[in-house]
């Protein structure tokens, strides 16, 4: 509703002001997403780094080359040089060296400690902020000083786009076009190209914000395209499907195949687009 939209914008503005205050008060910032980093986790991390950069606060994004989805890795190598990667990112192995008594750790697109790229970092950190769009689980980061969880949002990149918009003062906040493209790809991913129920007015406004910063929607779309091997794997899984009940489809992957969780999710999304299918279970 219109009233709800107004409420969300007021909340986003308040959250942006609070987060900016915490970043300014910190000695440095470490930004961390979840294991098997996807485009939304990394995109929202880059957006948060841009906020820190505009506030002249040293910030690093935790990145593990061994725990990243193939599409995310492809986007990183396409948009950034090796020097850029070394400047922006830090490995889970080296991140503890950057943790000081006044460091702010911002966790994005996840709120379960066990699912983060470096759970040890959360055990040692004294100041932790959480930005997430998933419904709160029983397992939660202990005593964060800032929590922005909005299940009505389509993605973490949508939330961070709003934070960038409302954190902007004169002069306008800078967001590199590569970061904006990454964030747009994250929104595409989590909304399944705006088909998800969580895609609303705020989602399209977030995309508009990112386009203003030079996001390349063609390139963002390319990042989500399947390699031939993945396409063949999806087709193979779908061919091994059964319908135990009316409107329910169960698809089984070959135990010999090594399959990313994102691929299983895509098979489920694709199956749910078939008329008459109300529920789908993909096991692999």
Where are these regions (language model features)?
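Short acidic, glycine/serine/threonine-rich loops at helix termini
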Residues: 42-44, 72-77, 118-119, 140-143, ...
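Helix-enriched interaction subdomains in cytosolic or periplasmic regions
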Residues: 1-11
